[in-house]
Curated annotation (Swiss-Prot):
Any one GO biological process: tRNA methylation
Comment field (misc): Reaction proceeds by a ping-pong mechanism involving intermediate methylation of a conserved cysteine residue.
Keyword Coiled coil part of the UniProt annotation: no
Entry protein name: Probable dual-specificity RNA methyltransferase RlmN
Amino acid sequence: MQTRLSNIKHLSRQELRQAIANLGEPAYRTRQIHQWIFSHRAATFEEMTTISLELRNKLADQFRIGFPILADCQQDGSANDPFSTVKLLLELDDNEKIETVLIPSENRMTACVSSQVGCPLQCRFCASGQTGFKRNLSADEIIDQVFSLNDFIRTKHESNEITNIVFMGMGEPLLNFENLKESIEVLSDQSYKFNLPQRKITISTVGIIPGINELGKSGLKTKLAISLHSASQETRESLIPVASEFSLTQLRKTLSEYTSQTGEPVTLVYMLLKGINDSVEDARLLVKFSRSFLCKINLIDYNSIINMKFKPVFNETKDMFIQHILDAGIHVTVRKSHGASINAACGQLAAKGTQKAENRNNL
């Protein structure tokens, strides 16, 4: 049985540089090949016409260029509605599956992408953590989610493409920092075709303090969102087990340093859960926590998940909570839920699908 060749896309830039050197080629070839893969999206080495035939043959002898398989596609609402949420289930090289979501609106096309297969953090209100953790995604597996969504957009909106990216899919992005960073650098590279400004990219974390510090020093110009969900240490630990390792006091100090360093506000994401974090006292604690650094608050509703007993709050409770924050002079928004009917909303991604797999040409 013939051994399957390695997927060249899985190599980091440093690993690709070393592979090219091992072939006896000059370093500048690395950039050329990388551009063919991630800017021109070459499917074969034969397409790389600016590279010698000899090198193309060498590459073809050692590597292949692989793509994720579209295993399922679900749309929230009518297939003819250009603004309905879409969820893609992608099958990776090792047969693991991830989900990525397109959230269209009149002014933007947002890609919600995953950073890991599953999630190790097991947040109590999130389906991704209940599936278990398999592995980190490579940089190309992150990038290919964006490209897959872009391909889908072109079947519905000929002149549109992804305008924003949020790392709010499966996994904790800051636990996969190197691959996260490389994927962002590729997607924002001004010499590549996609070329999305980093300010259009948001990284969401539950508050991994070493990762926040690393992000602050990385030179990336992305936005940062913190999945806070409670400003009570006890309540937060009951919802987010890893919060026991990173106290709210530590997190507040880290975010104060981060915003001072970057000059940019962070977004505090707060999912309202009936009877758990929705009281006047909870609102007071949230206001107190947010006064220490530059931030805005984004409230979201709970999206139902099978086998979880949480419930969304009543509108009256939500209005009271919002008013308390506004009275304190703090900017607050309420995020509209997208894709709940296809389990594509916040906290619902669990890499489940039903449709037969097909190749990328059918995206």
